[in-house]
Structure formats: structure tokens, C-alpha cells
């Protein structure tokens, strides 16, 4: 599912998995073109993540819907619904789990295209990059 083949035939895509994700939620999926820029940095990834629309925050056992707002809005106090809450590192870490580019920064770099192959292909991928 992450290759140009489907059911033993060429499917017309370099990566069918990438093609499906491209139409799922373009704000939080796909290939981040800035990662190929000279001088690419973690700061650029943070800037990108700050502008990705949020889903929610979790407070006092409840999810608070923040759809349509960015983490940048939240951290700058621009969201009336949560004006009494201050962003926490837990909020940031939760937000980062809702972003799904092809290569995702976590405590490691998650190569998302490798999550949909058979066991031999998955092992080969990690051998290649490991």
C-alpha cells in the first residue's frame, strides 16, 4: 500500500499511501517541502506545527474542541473559549500527535511510509535507515 503497486500491477502513483493521505487532511499530511531547504531546522518544523489547525485540548477530564484554531492562536491567547487556560507542554505534545506528514518528528524521526508493508519490506526499510 505504500508503493507504486496494487494487486501486482502498477497503480500510477509513486506511493499509493501518500496519495490517499494527500486527500485526507492537507493541513496535517503530505510531504513537507521545506525539509529539503538548505538550513532546514527543528525551528522550521515547530513553525509549521504552530500553524497546523488544532483538534482539541484536554482539561479536567473533558475534551475542549479547538477545531479551526492553531496552536499559535492558543499560545497567544486568541481563543476566547479557552482564555482561562494556559498552554502546557502536554497540550503541545498532544497537538504534535495530530500531525501526520510523511516524516514526523517525535523523539525520533518516524518514517510514515513504512507502516503499511509486509514484514519483509518493513524490516528492509529499517535496515536501510537503521
What spans do the regions from the language model cover?
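C-terminal accessory/tail domains of diverse enzymes
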Residues: 1-130
Amino acid at each position: 500500500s505504500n508503493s507504486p503497486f496494487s494487486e501486482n500491477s502498477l497503480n500510477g502513483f509513486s506511493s499509493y499511501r501518500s496519495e490517499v493521505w494527500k486527500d485526507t487532511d492537507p493541513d496535517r499530511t503530505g510531504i513537507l517541502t521545506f525539509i529539503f531547504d538548505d538550513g532546514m531546522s527543528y525551528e522550521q518544523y515547530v513553525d509549521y506545527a504552530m500553524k497546523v489547525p488544532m483538534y482539541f485540548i484536554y482539561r479536567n477530564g473533558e475534551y475542549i474542541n479547538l477545531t479551526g484554531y492553531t496552536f499559535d492562536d492558543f499560545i497567544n491567547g486568541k481563543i476566547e473559549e479557552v482564555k482561562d487556560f494556559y498552554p502546557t507542554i502536554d497540550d503541545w505534545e498532544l497537538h504534535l500527535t495530530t500531525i501526520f506528514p510523511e516524516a514526523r518528528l517525535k523523539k525520533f524521526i518516524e518514517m510514515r511510509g513504512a507502516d503499511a508493508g509486509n514484514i519483509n519490506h518493513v524490516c528492509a526499510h529499517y535496515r536501510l535507515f537503521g
